[in-house]
Amino acid sequence: MDNSLLAVRDINHKYIVVERKYSELLYQNRYDNSELTYNDMHFIGITGGVGAGKTAILSYLESNYPCRVMLADEIAHDVMEPGRDCYRKLQELFAKDQVFEADGQIDRKRMAQVLFSDEEKRLALNNIVHPAVKQYVIDEMNRERAAQKNEVLILEAALLIEEHYDEICDELWYIYTSEKNRRERLKLNRGYSDEKIDNIFASQLSESTYREVCREEIDNNHLPEDAFSQIDALMKARQVEKVQKRQTTEE
């Protein structure tokens, strides 16, 4: 083999030939982006069941890698604010339900009560908000690619699969935690009853569906450090792929 080349092993334990000058970069514990450009920003969608511990995973990624994290729930909240994309449609949908405060803000507790008893209205709300959230995500993705500031863009969304974000993400990651562990976390951290947890679990996708659609699975059943080490390995593997892609482009 050429002395300028080196065989390294990726996350799937397959050997990939890369330039030797990148080998030190690939085995650091964190991203070193000094040798790489941002014009091929990687877009990762992250999902998993309620109580899977996604918040800790996202916090670790944001703290240790050059990435931006977007939360679909926060985006949904934002697009429903007065003057934003969905607001006028929501005014029409909830015109008779007294869900708007005097200053125009939405009384979200009151809205939740209305939606709980009106399935048709809940579906109508989803048909308004979900497309607006997806369009916001697409716009931000395009801005990030143009700005070339972040190596990785991450979106966390409970409905990542249902809303077909695989169409715009480069890959999806599934944060896996057993139902038993998720139930314990939801009781301890959020005070949820078994009945509420059962209803939540019944409304979510099966583990097999998550695994079928998502490229990667992170086991978050044990210590946080165990999950973090899996993330480090995945991010190193993505860096190997990026270097290999860059080599191919330059040849």
Segments predicted by a language model, with ranges:
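ATP-binding Walker
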Residues: 52
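Walker A/P-loop
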Residues: 55
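C-terminal structural segments of small proteins and small subunits
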Residues: 2-22
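NTP-dependent small-molecule kinase module
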Residues: 25-41, 139-152, 166-175, 179-192, ...
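ATP-dependent small-molecule kinase phosphotransfer cores
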Residues: 77-149
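Short beta-strand-centered segment that lines the nucleotide-binding/catalytic pocket of NTP-utilizing
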Residues: 67-80
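Hydrophobic anchor at the beta1->P-loop junction of P-loop NTPases
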Residues: 46
